C-alpha cells in the first residue's frame, strides 16, 4: 500500500444519488424519517446522453433533498434501456453515484483520468447543465458524477 500525505482538496460532495423502483414510496419513507425531498422533476428523451459511446434516452424522474449538508437525489427510471433502467435491473436499486461539486469540470476529468478513472457517460441538459460520470477500477461499484450547473 502506498503511503502518501493527504493533499488539500476543494472537492465537496454535492449529493449522493440512489436509483429506486418507486420514487413516491421512497419519498414517503424518507418523509417518515423527517427527510424532505423538495424538488421533483421529470426528464425525457430530449436530453442528449452518451452512455458507453452510444446515444441513449434519459427518461427518469429525479427528486432532490438534503440530509444535513449532504444532498440526496432519488432517481426512478421511466424508460427502457436508460443507464438508470439498466442499473435498476442489474442491482434492484441502490446508490448509483456520488456527485462532486466546486470543481473545474475539465480540470477534474483530466486529474481523475490521470489517476485511472474512466468517463463512461455524459448528459447535457440544454447548454447550461452537463453531467459527466466516471468509474474507478480500484473502487468497484462506485461512480463519480461531475456536475456543471443545477436543474
Predicted regions and their residues:
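A cross-kingdom feature marking solvent-exposed beta-strand/loop segments within repeated
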Residues: 41-57, 80-85, 95, 125-131
